[in-house]
């Protein structure tokens, strides 16, 4: 893809800043209040932070109450049917706030909004929604919102575009603990069950200098953890044409002085390499944490999923990563019940989980996405049967996670204290360098700081301890 076509010109981005000023001036007598509700992955979280940055530049303050908001933004996820149903439920509930405040502007954006059938459904059945735009139009949100205000009409911007890169968009990040940094956008993998490449476009890598400058700035601001984001970070740089890959980027970021930890997600096994693992092992600031989705432990199912690796390749990668990083925390994704999968094939996945012994596993029953090849495959196995396979898989993984967590009891771990615990028995939540959740007692002044935590107990999902 031509880089000149991918990069949004500076003058077009400056034009968006002008629209932000115009909207702020339009509402100077009573500044707008906005609510941004985010569904889905960390990339959506990062996108929402840019949306909030643009809204803040428009003079907005923020609220969590849609009834108090002049602008409501739902940033949506299309990865599973359940996520879409939640969004439609929320859209339905907003009819009441719109009725109470007819001037309220309701915006639908994100991956779900990029799907033409969704945009048409919203156009016909959710007439209180004023603005619909996909991920490719995120950078021109101020212009689209300005059109809603000045032209008094509904605006839809879901054109079928390859995607772009917009640098320098405003951003609002909460606190100084964690920051998300997108290093690339889109996906070229075309897994047969996945809709991401249809709604996020083809792969586009940001220039490494831009990423390095952004991370250096975040470290200087005091952020303790920085997570690099992409649909497949391991393919970073392929489109740049300069012989620069993700391992090179990690090595460069590791040279930034400071007390910050670098994480990354998500990864594709086909692009993972020994070079990447060697860079991680030699680094000072890169977490010994790897999320490497395997999706299935059956080679036939992997081929049907259009995942271009086999179980042997996956196991070789894991063996090498663990050899150079014995302390590695390994997590993965698994889909159970892919169309045509048999019980014996599902049990191959269970066997792989038993062999690899992941620290944690994100497990899902297959959810057909309209427009994907997998959605057209015959799927004769009843949901109830798939649920049994799923429960078996979860039982195995839960036992492994509980056992692995138990080995930390009695140890003292350096953790980043990141907030107040939802569990009434504990004051704080923290994360180990490997990303393990820790509920702990301690002074709330520790939030945002690295502290040593003495681990006193554990269960399947978390560690428990005391801040020293």
Language-model-derived ranges and their functions:
Residues 37, 196, 229-231, 265-267, ...:
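Generic beta-strand/beta-sheet core signal
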Residues 174-177, 187-189, 286, 296, ...:
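Short flexible coil/turn linkers enriched for glycine and charged/polar residues
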Residues 106-108, 115-117, 220-348, 354:
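Conserved SAM/AdoMet-binding glycine-rich loop
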Residues 1-236, 275, 290, 312-323, ...:
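Proteins enriched for Cys/Gly/acidic motifs involved in redox and nucleic-acid/cofactor modification
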Residues 191, 211, 228, 264, ...:
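Conserved, mostly hydrophobic/aromatic
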Residues 78-79, 200-201, 240-243, 303-309, ...:
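Short glycine-enriched, charge-decorated loop/helix-capping segments at active-site entrances
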